A protein has these predicted regions:
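HotDog/MaoC-like acyl-thioester-processing domains
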Residues: 1-3, 96-153
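Hot-dog-fold acyl-thioester-processing enzymes
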Residues: 1-91
Length: 153
């Protein structure tokens, strides 16, 4: 059965939240070289002292990916059964508006902006999702962008 996913264009996805935790940032810094950022070691006041410190800029795409995964259901929103199908992340573009802070809670809003078919060794649909990520407290825009998902037929 062929699925026409173009009917999804314009569909808003679920709102989601993510908190930039010290644990996630420290785990991230354990595998990514960020010379100007060091994992917090728990001294100098522990989590309270770490809260409010800048997260490394390279952590922002991680927040975008994790946050976006909370905004959709593969079957309901993409008409795709991930248990029997193959999906891959595609391109990602992010515009940064201000740094993320450790301890900050963010709100993610997203919508399906485009769907089109491509042909490689296999035919697949590309679903493009645009998103905004804002501070939950102040509501200021932290980052905006686009993420695509490749759904193989």
């Amino acid at each position: 059965m062929t699925v026409d996913r173009t009917v999804l264009i314009g569909r808003p996805l679920r709102a989601a939240t993510y908190t930039v935790s010290e644990i996630d940032v420290n785990d991230f810094l354990g595998v990514v070289a960020e010379p100007d950022f060091a994992p917090a070691d728990g001294s100098e006041g522990g989590a309270e002292a770490a809260s409010g410190r800048l997260a490394p800029p390279s952590f922002a795409p991680f927040v975008a990916v994790l946050g976006l995964l909370k905004t959709f259901d593969w079957q309901e929103d993409f008409l795709f059964d991930y248990r029997t199908g193959t999906a891959m992340f595609g391109e990602q573009a992010i515009e940064f508006h201000r740094p993320l802070l450790v301890g900050e809670s963010v709100a993610i809003s997203a919508a399906i902006s485009d769907v089109y078919e491509k042909q490689g060794k296999q035919t697949f649909d590309v679903i493009e999702v645009t998103f905004d990520i804002k501070s939950r407290e102040e509501g200021d825009l932290l980052m905006s962008g686009q993420q695509s998902y490749n759904l193989f037929k």
